[in-house]
From Swiss-Prot:
The keyword Repeat does not apply. Signal peptide: none annotated. It comes from Trichlorobacter lovleyi (strain ATCC BAA-1151 / DSM 17278 / SZ). Pfam families: Complex1_49kDa. NDH-1 is composed of 14 different subunits. Subunits NuoB, C, D, E, F, and G constitute the peripheral sector of the complex. It catalyses: a quinone + NADH + 5 H(+)(in) = a quinol + NAD(+) + 4 H(+)(out). Keywords: Cell inner membrane, Cell membrane, Membrane, NAD, Quinone, Translocase, Transport, Ubiquinone. InterPro entries: NADH_Q_OxRdtase_suD (IPR001135), NADH_UbQ_OxRdtase_49kDa_CS (IPR014029), NDH1_su_D/H (IPR022885), NiFe-Hase_large (IPR029014). The lineage of its organism: Bacteria, Pseudomonadati, Thermodesulfobacteriota, Desulfuromonadia, Geobacterales. GO terms for cellular component: plasma membrane. Its EC number is 7.1.1.-. It is a peripheral membrane protein. This is NADH-quinone oxidoreductase subunit D. It comes from the Bacteria. Belongs to the complex I 49 kDa subunit family.
């Protein structure tokens, strides 16, 4: 206590509502927040430095562990940066499957956000429902990659393997049902007086402040800024898809909640469009200097075996240069800045994680709010400490 009025407390790093090992030093006047100082680094693993001692292929699994709730979005951003340096084109089938999986990833990330955000405020039913739907997406991950979370599925030039025959039906059935599930969530929350009291007018940040800080993703669009990399700076074939970019009007927690629900509906539409575009074809580029040979060749010819061994043991050289690639991850703009010195390992990799930047808005959003409202504000930012600390 200072002057018997201002109290300084710690929230976290082990607190269920900080969504990871986030510590916040909070100054309070009674229950009113005066200042918040986020303290990060408890989950630092040195991903950027580790990449300098691994080949481009060996670096890919590290990206799974940034935002571990959206591994394929991480994979996509990294692979697009590598492919840009290599100058190779991805086959249409592989590109379409990438779109399907990154939009399913967006859905499952938003489902985890909704489940935890609702649970923080006391709506346990939505938590159970959202994790029920997420389980289907986790099963789809396992179906195509063998892993439920850290998928390591994308490759430079395409995918590690083609999807099985049952993939298309499973995804089509899920996205047909998903809008009805979203209706259920809205029926439980949107008109609920407790939910509205806890979210409307809470965590307000203006479009100007959000832009100045560098917020991206649903947190930015909730403040009324109409910006989405998929539409405005399209990549991976997104220019071929029709979808709406929702924005808020009141710049508060409730608007950010509504933006994410609409995004979930739009992701279902994108997946349906992608399924219609999904045609037979190769899932790896014709780039033998980068891509592994087919398994038949590896098992039945010495040339194929040597080819596989060379790429696995030495990696593939990437032309000298530097590139930045940003993608619209579920939480905002995820960027990879790669510098190549012509070898098979990155000279430097810099990750621009959306959660790290979005977290900088916490003081602006929470200043003057009640301590009890901080839980809702943290939830609406949808941060993951894996990508903040890296």
């Amino acid at each position: 206590m200072a002057n018997n009025e201002i109290m300084t407390i710690n929230m976290g790093p082990q607190h269920p509502s900080t969504h990871g090992v986030l510590r916040m030093v909070i100054e309070l006047d009674g229950e009113t927040i005066l200042k918040i100082d986020p303290d990060i680094g408890y989950l630092h693993r040195g991903v950027e430095k580790l990449s300098e001692h691994r080949t481009y292929h060996q670096t890919l699994p590290l990206t799974d562990r940034l935002d571990y709730l959206a591994p394929m979005s991480n994979n996509l951003g990294y692979m697009l940066a590598v492919e840009k340096l290599l100058g190779i084109e991805v086959p249409e089938r592989a590109q379409t499957i990438r779109i399907i999986m990154t939009e399913l990833t967006r859905l499952q990330s938003h489902l985890v956000w909704l489940a935890c955000h609702a649970l923080d405020i006391g709506a346990m039913t939505v938590f159970i429902y959202a994790f029920r739907e997420r389980e289907v997406i986790m099963e789809t991950y396992e179906l195509i990659s063998g892993a439920r979370m850290t998928s390591n599925f994308f490759r430079a030039g395409g995918l590690s393997q083609d999807v099985p025959a049952e993939f298309e039906k499973k995804v089509r059935d899920f996205v047909a049902e998903m809008p009805g599930f979203i209706d259920t969530y809205e029926g439980l929350l949107t008109g609920n007086p407790i939910w509205r009291k806890r979210t409307i007018g809470n965590g307000v940040i203006s479009a100007e402040d959000a832009t100045d800080i560098g917020i991206t993703g649903p947190a930015l669009r909730g403040s009324g800024v109409d910006f989405d990399l998929r539409r405005d700076i399209p990549y991976a074939g997104y220019e071929n898809y029709q979808f709406k970019v929702p924005t808020g009007k009141n710049c508060d927690t409730f608007d950010r909640y509504q933006v994410r629900l609409i995004e979930m509906r739009e992701s279902c539409k994108i997946v349906n469009q992608a399924l219609e575009r999904l045609k037979p074809g190769p899932v790896l580029a014709d780039a033998p200097q980068v891509c592994y040979p087919p398994k038949d060749s590896v098992y039945n010819s010495i040339e194929g075996l040597i080819h596989h061994f060379k790429i696995a043991s030495e990696g593939y050289p990437v032309p000298e240069g530097e590139v930045y690639m940003g993608v619209e991850a579920p939480k905002g703009e995820l960027g990879f800045y790669l510098v190549s010195d012509g070898s098979s390992k990155p000279y430097r990799m810099r990750v621009r994680p959306p959660s790290f930047v979005n977290l900088q808005a916490i003081e602006k959003m929470a200043k003057g709010a009640m301590l009890a409202d901080l839980v809702a504000i943290i939830g609406t930012l949808d941060i993951v400490l894996g990508e903040i600390d890296r």
